Regions:
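Non-catalytic, mobile gating and regulatory segments of ester bond hydrolases
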Residues: 1-92, 96-203
Length: 203
């Protein structure tokens, strides 16, 4: 399964635009045949990295991320009375929203909904190896921009892993280590536009 440039950039745009949104998520149907669900994350790294509790307790997933996934999915069902199964659902998220999006995808995938895909930007590791095995066949574009430090958390020594290979986005202003600045979702979106301009093809 592949995702077009149009779908991926719309997903990342929604990840950017969800921050000032009143809800914890943003839904877009601008791309024909697709529904894009963007989950709110955070642009602030220092507050939550220092306080993050590195616990895998339920279904091999970080408990906090899993709670966010359950809450967001419940809100979505109430707000939209379900989703059109004929449209591909692309779940997207930046930062903590990326981890939440991954676990929403896990919930839907395990329930038998295979008409989904995942786009994440600067996501921390969401869980352990059992989670990775469960969704290994899910289409997931996992973007990391420059020196972004968030994808390196929680530590792999605590049993945390990423579920899919990385797609690296170049930092055009990479004159120093700027792992916090590189986490900004606006920088992710701009770098993705340049990435696709250089590729001229869909992933």
């Amino acid at each position: 399964m592949t995702l077009s440039k149009e779908v991926v950039l719309e997903a990342l745009r929604c990840c950017r635009d969800v921050y000032p949104h009143t809800e914890d998520f943003l839904v877009s149907r601008k791309v024909a045949g697709h529904t894009i669900l963007a989950v709110e994350g955070t642009n602030e790294t220092t507050d939550w990295i220092t306080n993050l509790k590195f616990l895998i307790k339920r279904d091999d997933c970080h408990r906090g991320f899993k709670n966010n996934a359950n809450r967001t999915l419940a809100q979505l069902v109430v707000a939209y009375e379900g989703l059109n199964p004929e449209r591909k659902l692309v779940i997207a998220g930046h930062s903590l929203g990326g981890a939440t999006a991954t676990l929403i995808a896990d919930l839907l995938w395990e329930s038998g909904n295979k008409n989904i895909a995942l786009v994440t930007a600067g996501s921390p590791r969401p869980g352990g190896r059992r989670l990775r095995r469960r969704i290994k066949d899910l289409c997931h574009l996992r973007f990391v921009h420059g020196d972004d430090i968030v994808p390196g958390t929680p530590p792999w020594l605590a049993g945390y892993v990423h579920t899919h290979p990385v797609v690296k986005l170049k930092d055009e202003n990479d004159t120093r280590f700027d792992g916090v600045a590189d986490h900004n979702i606006g920088s992710y979106y701009d770098a993705a536009v340049k990435y696709y301009e250089s590729k001229k093809v869909a992933l």
